[in-house]
Amino acid sequence: MLSLLWSVFLVHVAIYLVNTIGASTIDNLLWLLYLKVPTSTSKKYKEQNRLKREVVQLKRDMNNTSSQDEFAKWAKLRRKHDKTMEEYEAINKQLVSQKTSFDWGVKIVRWFGTSGLKFFLQFWYSKTPVFHLPEGWLPYYVAWLLSFPRAPMGSVSIQIWSNVCATAITTMAEVVTAVLLQRATAAAAPAAKKTQ
């Protein structure tokens, strides 16, 4: 089984990734993946796309047909366009409703998988030390602070370890980003000199 130390660290990595990538981006990606699965929703999505293309084609045909010179043809196209547009709007309304409920489900699962899990671990393991410190290694007040609020004295509590993990992950991500940006600008500088 995964130790408490690594469990808390991985939960914070997941939280950081969700916050960095963006919840709406993840929701949209999962929605697109869900539409690839053969379900009734994916059939509706394919039908919606077909109707959308048909509406655009009918609109194009109507614009290319003179309403005065070829009124019968134009009126027939107009009726077909209106009927197809109604079908498209009905299916679109159903898909929007299903996407809204899908998004709520994804948000709930995401919260329970990240922040909810973090809160659960902090509550459930509040008296459990993440790891012990060597005795006499730190002054009493520092050892007390590291074991705050309920871990045994001389150990690191899950709350403190959770804060350390969150801070370390954020700091390391900023360092990696800065290094990558510095390399990108260093690589772009010689290319800019060559063009001048």
Curated annotation (Swiss-Prot):
The chain crosses the membrane at residues 5-24, 111-131, 156-172. It is a multi-pass membrane protein. One of its GO terms (biological process) is tail-anchored membrane protein insertion into ER membrane. Residues 1-4, 132-155 are lumenal. Pfam families: CHD5. Residues 42-99 form a coiled coil. It comes from the Eukaryota. Residues 25-110, 173-196 are cytoplasmic. Keywords: Coiled coil, Endoplasmic reticulum, Membrane, Transmembrane, Transmembrane helix, Transport. Its main location: endoplasmic reticulum. GO terms for molecular function: protein-membrane adaptor activity. It is found in: Endoplasmic reticulum membrane. GO terms for cellular component: endoplasmic reticulum membrane; GET complex. InterPro entries: Get1 (IPR028945), Get1_fungi (IPR027538), Helix_hairpin_bin_sf (IPR029012). Gene3D superfamilies: Helix hairpin bin (1.10.287.660). Belongs to the WRB/GET1 family. HAMAP family: Get1. Required for the post-translational delivery of tail-anchored (TA) proteins to the endoplasmic reticulum. Acts as a membrane receptor for soluble get3, which recognizes and selectively binds the transmembrane domain of TA proteins in the cytosol. Interacts with get3. This is Protein get1. It comes from Aspergillus niger (strain ATCC MYA-4892 / CBS 513.88 / FGSC A1513). The gene is get1.
